[in-house]
Amino acid sequence: MKRGENMYQILDSGERTVFPTGSVRDMHEGKGDMVSIPWESILRLSKHYENGAKKYQRWNFRKGIPVSSFIDSACRHLAKYQCGMDDEDHLAAAAFNVLGAMLMENTMPEMNDLPLRKGKKTFDYFE
């Protein structure tokens, strides 16, 4: 690569969205709907990640945890929430564990130890 050259290209689907103002953008279908994500819930979840980092060390969950452990914990936190327990943020804890299971599916599929999920293809955003 020569100096000043950009190593990245702007990807192009070949399809366009034309806005009422006349501006044009590439289509966004199939890329996910980032604008609809409930960011106030993500901010709440981020506090759970912050507290977990203090207890276990940041990125600990990325080292590899069996999916069964994440699912077990998520279910337990949902049950505690439904039972009215408010000793901790059980919904944030459940969300953390569901995201952890999804992370293992995507980055460390060998950690998926659930008998009915072993060896099965899981959703891959990047396909």
Spell out what each predicted region is.
Residues 1-127:
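Intrinsically disordered, low-complexity regulatory regions
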